[in-house]
Amino acid sequence: MAKYTMDMVLQYAKVFPENADYGDPKGNRVAKSIADKGGQYIVQGYFTDPDQISQLLEDGLDPEPMNSPRIIDGDAQYGIGKYMKLKRMVKDVKNFTDRYGKPFEKDYGGAPNIVNLTNGMDKKTLWNFEEDGPLGNGTKAKVQFETYSNGAGVRLLNVGITEHVPYTSGEPTEDDKMFMVG
């Protein structure tokens, strides 16, 4: 497994227990699958330099696992306009056998560490969802992730927030208000 830490711009960051994607047991196939697995922490991490993508591909990242592009063209206002979905399951237990034949479990899931680096490394703290708030689109961060299964898998590990953009839910437009009753 190779581990990377990259400067990225975040979009749709659902990286806290309070806002993780827990799926929907009554939703579409994908939503049901996420719900069945207990949910996921997920973010679209926009690259800030084309060399980041080159490094990953040179190191063996599978650019199209299961015939689905890994590097996706996105919103040009974030980074270089290309992103990768980075996720981590809420619970991701794998069974292994040690060298003595004894079985053991390892959980690769759980919430990633979210660290507040906005005041510098010497004043870093854990991000507090209630006090610091959710992460808005355009938040800048140092994102740590690892690749596994010969580059076919990518797992989110940690996020260090360097520049916070507050989350806004999007106020209704005048057109939206026209259809709101009560």
Segments from the language model and where they lie:
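Short regulatory "switch" loops immediately downstream of catalytic or recognition motifs
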Residues: 91-96, 112-118, 164
